[in-house]
UniProtKB/Swiss-Prot annotation:
It comes from Bacillus thuringiensis (strain Al Hakam). It is found in: Cytoplasm. This is Ribosome-recycling factor. Keywords: Cytoplasm, Protein biosynthesis. One of its GO terms (molecular function) is ribosomal large subunit binding. GO terms for biological process: translational termination. The gene is frr. Responsible for the release of ribosomes from messenger RNA at the termination of protein biosynthesis. May increase the efficiency of translation by recycling ribosomes from one round of translation to another. PANTHER family: MITOCHONDRIAL RIBOSOME RECYCLING FACTOR PSEUDO 1 (PTHR20982:SF3), RIBOSOME RECYCLING FACTOR (PTHR20982). Gene3D superfamilies: 3.30.1360.40, Ribosome-recycling factor. Belongs to the RRF family. Disulfide bonds: none annotated. Pfam families: RRF.
Amino acid sequence: MGQQVLKSSNEKMEKAVAAYSRELATVRAGRASASVLDKVQVDYYGAPTPVVQLANITVPEARLLVIQPYDKTSIGDIEKAILKADLGLNPSNDGTVIRIAFPALTEERRRDLVKVVKKYAEEAKVAVRNVRRDGNDDLKKLEKAGEITEDDLRGYTEDIQKETDKYIAKVDEIAKNKEKEIMEV
């Protein structure tokens, strides 16, 4: 029973770190990346639809994103959705494709982005710690029910703590790499 709690906690911690990595992909670091548009929803025939489902997105240059809609009539809607998403980007529409030039980041903007990265890192750590707390609670219930001994409880609790430390270190490493990427000029 205790092994199942450990396995479940481990999987949940892995998911928390994966979600953090996906969240960081939307933080732009001066280079063009299609992932900045991941959360942009276009009102397409009355239904909110992700840009990636409506267009081919390419990165021909380090600071340029080209969006080529599959349906040319949706180009205006895509442009409006990008502006409405308030990503600090200015799309230019030439009738067939939308080009987004990424301006060079100022020192102040870089520092702001690092703060955002740190905030996301803290949220990910809290998520990992919540999984630890839930796992420990489940183990205590098993011990109360007599399914595991007090020694087993202590051992499993230590194992969950080791996993927690491992995943928090992973979050710190990911954050450090992203901060380094952002601060590169």
